[in-house]
From Swiss-Prot:
Pfam families: BRCT (PF00533), DNA_ligase_aden (PF01653), DNA_ligase_OB (PF03120), DNA_ligase_ZBD (PF03119), HHH_2 (PF12826), HHH_5 (PF14520). Its cofactor is Mg(2+); Mn(2+). One of its GO terms (biological process) is DNA repair. Zn(2+) binds at C395, C398, C413, C418. SMART domains: BRCT, LIGANc. The lineage of its organism: Bacteria, Bacillati, Bacillota, Bacilli, Lactobacillales. It catalyses: NAD(+) + (deoxyribonucleotide)n-3'-hydroxyl + 5'-phospho-(deoxyribonucleotide)m = (deoxyribonucleotide)n+m + AMP + beta-nicotinamide D-nucleotide. One of its GO terms (cellular component) is cytosol. NAD(+) binds at D29, S30, E31, Y32, D33, S78, L79, E107, R130, E164, K278, K302. It comes from the Bacteria. Keywords: DNA damage, DNA repair, DNA replication, Ligase, Magnesium, Manganese, Metal-binding, NAD, Zinc. This is DNA ligase. InterPro entries: BRCT_dom, BRCT_dom_sf, DisA/LigA_HHH, DNA_ligase, DNA_ligase_AS, DNA_ligase_CS, DNAligase_adenylation, DNAligase_N.
Amino acid sequence: MKERMSELVELLNRYAHEYYTADRPSVSDSEYDRLYRELAELEEKYPTDILPDSPTHRVGGKILEGFEKYPHQYPLFSLQDAFSREELLAFDQRVRKEFPQVSYLCELKIDGLSISLTYENGILVAGATRGDGSVGENITENLKRVKDIPLTLKEPLDITVRGECYMPKASFDAVNQLRQENGEPEFANPRNAAAGTLRQLDTAVVAKRNLATFLYQEASPTQVGSQEEVLNKLADLDFSVNPTHILADSIESVWEFIEKIAEERDSLPYEIDGIVIKVNDLAVQEELGFTVKAPKWAIAYKFPAEEKEAQLLSVDWTVGRTGVVTPTANLTPVQLAGTTVSRATLHNVDYIAEKDIRQKDTVIVYKAGDIIPAVLRVVESKRVSEEALEVPSHCPSCESELVHFEDEVALRCINPLCPAQIKEGLIHFASRDAMNITGLGPAVVEKLFAQNLVKDVAGIYRLTIENLLELENFKEKSANKLYTAIQASKKNSAERLLFGLGIRHVGSKASRILLEKFHDIPRLSQASQEEIAAIDSLGTVIAQSLHTYFEQEGSQILLAELQEAGVNLDYLGQKAAADAALSGMTVVLTGKLQKLTRNQAKEKLQSLGANVSGSVSKKTDLVVAGADAGSKLAKAQELGIEIRDEDWLDSL
């Protein structure tokens, strides 16, 4: 029976590839169903002989507890956007300045969810979302239900590939029809539907929604020499690869392709929002390298956004964490790119003056980058009032006089004690990419302010459980949970703290680069502007901003208070070079941890030289198991893998 099961799996996977990926079915649906039922019956009788690539794995039926974080071995970078032909020409000039004979591979930009698939010995062992590019979510079980993703490859390869998971238009219409019949809210657009589906805890729902993929990148080291060859290799491995792409020798040919696809866009069976242009030669890609945020060898041209008319009702002015006062328009509701829009950014006071926006104007609204609603221009022929918009002279939060610096487009509150700035700064400090203090969100920050318990980020670490119990709706359990999260954040690597301080122009990636260079925040604070500006991919703007921040007495007092409170100021990655107790080991975390958050545990393991994986396999060296560990612990025991508890990790 084992041989017959293997034969059926091979046949069914081949037929599925012909149907879902190649679009060339060689057998009828009834014949496929007959073979599928035969396999299912055999697997029910002989469960120990079920093969890892059996198509029955795609049916669903498993309820997941949640999604673990998944650290990407190979980071996923976002792409620089272009919105005009001029921006594409500028990109081409930058590339050709170093490589005059370059050619470009142009691919459709699928409007879905970025995914990463990892295969070991040809078997799919992990599938994850992009997340922040460094850490995503492990959605392996859900991706196994996407019918055009191979569970096994033709060859026993160790390979990581990247692509886009999307919901075809026909599937989107069918899903929304069903939701309408069931009285459920409809998805706004196929991208939201795909993202929502992949985060379902019930894998059976994923299986029913007919998601699809296009793969386009081999993230792990490759033996081929061009992006075109990468696509051919992926297709040869039975991945679904979009056949609509061209190799262009000039930016003029790229633009012709863009114009052609723009005309055909609405007739495609899936949503796209642009064209991705990549240098074809992989060796040239490597030479060009990256900025902090994006590759220098690629750019994403975004199609012009949909535009709608709406009437301006009023304007709200809000203060951000850097003191910038931003105007937001309240509008008559309009449907825009699949969602109802009733608020849109007006950017800044200079923008209002430039566009001559007045009270009760009819305006054109669009979604900047297909995400953020913004006012584009006024429809002057429909103007009903000559009355100018009222621009505030004082801060809407602290009532300090606002300033408008000559070199800035926005109004700014420069009061360092402005409550709105401090609150926004605290929210940023506690956010996931900064200190990751679970439970310290906007509502709790508001309560802390109302009780006068916190005035700056150092005040977070002076909070006691008794303080937290003073907050409205806080019981002992919630107070203990937040207090534990605050204490755990003290052990974060210092790049999180640096990002959390909210220094202008210093993002999370720049923070990591800076701490890799200077090892701790005190040394960074003493570095000269020239030393910082000399770091590849940073430059003078970041150097000036850091110098301005650290020369302020208040900043030095804040750092001293944080250090006194026990907050770590060191870059933990340097410990790996010193003691690397787990150097080269593949470690898996499972279960609930009590002393550390999962991200902190991963950072500690990585600082000790470990590669942290989201799944257990024969290549796993060690499993750290917390409370209520489930299938991963069982699999580790079955494979004879060393198992340790959280106390062991804490002792390292």
